[in-house]
Curated annotation (Swiss-Prot):
It comes from the Eukaryota. Pancreas. Residues 62-72, 132-154, 223-246, 310-365 are cytoplasmic. This is P2Y purinoceptor 4. It is found in: Cell membrane. Disulfide bonds join 108-185. Receptor for UTP and UDP coupled to G-proteins that activate a phosphatidylinositol-calcium second messenger system. Not activated by ATP or ADP.
């Protein structure tokens, strides 16, 4: 439509160049929905994400020390979510102003970088929680060795650095360009570099999403098989129910936030590379734009994990909100997600090598 003056190239934030196909140049469609959907959804994520994660950080820092390994992972997850939601006001303005970016190229690069940094750090922190939980349920002795808070802290630092290192090329791909009086902040890159960007993005997706997703599914599959096997003369313990809640929340975050975004983004890239016809490009572009807010919504869903799995976290949160009596702080955090089977017995020693656990036979678990 001439009134919208919105071609596929404009909707993608691109201008004609050596990498543009004739299909893209000739395909026109209305994308005004984006200028309502994205500002509104990002505003909701900003309000909810900041409102949920800022108090969470405060509780972790001032009320929930000392941390166990799981609390360490959750703190870094909340920190990642908070950093991301603080960048959303610029995107809210950008889409509300119909793709006009007045903040400069450097901030454009940083905001686009921060989106993927949060996305993949969240994926890896959730994977760390999943592996940690798996070890506690299925291999309690190994959990003694690998579940130390210091090791968890080093692993979190490695996650931040590895994800940042993998995404450094994104700082070079993403840029701004002018369209008349409008300044665009590209979500991908220039048309002439799009092929290279797809190769880079696909490698990052496989390494930072595909592998962690597979590891998480395997861990939770093995955990669920063990947890759902009945124990003679024993009801399901609270620790087992907490484990099942953890499985449900993490899988929900993956299913709602991460999987749809990566599937639609892959189809979107393929449609452009294969020069699909206008109707297909139209549909794919709309679906891809719709799933972007879902990827951001993990910043709002992650705090649900803290509520469902941390008894001490819930108590401290009630106190922060004005309800409940103060509880004495103890060294053992009930945020710990490593729990041994109900009918296991352990002898704790100064070192993991000297500790031992006796668990039921495999045919009874």
């Amino acid at each position: 439509m001439a009134s919208t003056e919105s071609s596929l190239l404009r909707s993608l934030g691109l201008s004609p160049g050596p990498g543009s196909s004739e299909v893209e140049l000739d395909c026109w469609f209305d994308e005004d929905f984006k200028f309502i959907l994205l500002p509104v959804s990002y505003a909701v994520v900003f309000v909810l994400g900041l409102g949920l994660n800022a108090p969470t950080l405060w509780l972790f820092i001032f009320r929930l020390r000392p941390w166990d390994a799981t609390a360490t992972y959750m703190f870094h997850l909340a920190l990642s979510d908070t950093l991301y939601v603080l960048s959303l006001p610029t995107l809210i303005y950008y889409y509300a102003a119909h793709n006009h970016w007045p903040f400069g190229t450097e901030i454009c690069k940083f905001v686009r970088f921060l989106f993927y940094w949060n996305l993949y750090c969240s994926v890896l922190f959730l994977t760390c929680i999943s592996v940690h939980r798996y070890l506690g349920i299925c291999h309690p002795l190994r959990a003694l060795r690998w579940g130390r808070p210091r090791l968890a802290g080093l692993l979190c630092l490695a996650v931040w650095l590895v994800v940042a290192g993998c995404l450094v090329p994104n700082l070079f791909f993403v840029t701004t360009s002018n369209k008349g009086t409008t300044v665009l902040c590209h979500d991908t890159t220039r048309p002439e570099e799009f092929d290279h960007y797809v190769h880079f993005s696909s490698a990052v997706m496989g390494l930072l999403f595909g592998v962690p997703c597979l590891v998480t599914l395997v861990c939770y599959g093995l955990m669920a098989r063990r947890l759902y096997q009945p124990l003679p003369g024993s009801a399901q313990s609270s620790s087992r129910l907490r484990s099942l809640r953890t499985i449900a929340v993490v899988l929900t975050v993956f299913a709602v936030c991460f999987v749809p975004f990566h599937i639609t983004r892959t189809i979107y890239y393929l449609a452009r590379l294969l020069e699909a016809d206008c109707r297909v490009l139209n549909i794919v572009n709309v679906v891809y734009k719709v799933t972007r807010p879902l990827a951001s919504a993990n910043s709002c869903l992650d705090p649900v994990l803290y509520l469902l799995t941390g008894d001490k976290y819930r108590r401290q949160l009630r106190q922060l909100c004005g309800g409940g009596k103060p509880q004495p702080r103890t060294a053992a955090s009930s945020l710990a997600l490593v729990s041994l089977p109900e009918d296991s017995s352990c002898r704790w020693a100064a070192t993991p090598q000297d500790s031992s656990c006796s668990t039921p036979r495999a045919d009874r678990l």
